[in-house]
Amino acid sequence: EFPSKKDEGTGYAFRKDGQLYVGSIKAYNAKKNAWERTFDIVNAIKDIIDEFDLKDYHMAIETPIMGRNRKHSITLANCNGYFIGAIDGLVNGYTFIDNSKWCSYHLISGKREQRKEESLELLKQTGLVPLDCKDDNMADAYNILTYCEHLG
């Protein structure tokens, strides 16, 4: 059984004026290809940057995890490049964060499903989301934010 793709997308998290914001951008649409989904994510991120005036912010981007499917991995890398090109200049630079680094910092381990659960647990402990929240993209974004804040 394959997991549903309806929850595919990306999470975001930032602090502004002492307030923590977390959310996610749902990008999956069976009628759209990877490029079109990336375009939707870019536009949503641009809207967030504009709405919250985040142009002075430095963006952390999780390093894409390449799978076994070569064609898919190349598309993922190309879409990531498109994303970076589109947001470059809209924020004050960006840094790639390896999944292994932020997971290790938060003591998250195990296989993918277990890591998702542990990531979600950390977000739920903030009280920002309901206890039945299943949005691991948002959870990962929050945990990447707190990892980056720890780095200084």
From Swiss-Prot:
Protein name: Uncharacterized protein near lysin gene
SUPFAM superfamilies: Ribonuclease H-like
InterPro entries, sorted: Lactococcus_phage_712_M3, RNaseH-like_sf, RNaseH_sf
Molecular function (Gene Ontology), one example: nucleic acid binding
Highest taxon in the source lineage: Viruses
TM ranges: none
Pfam family, one: DUF3882
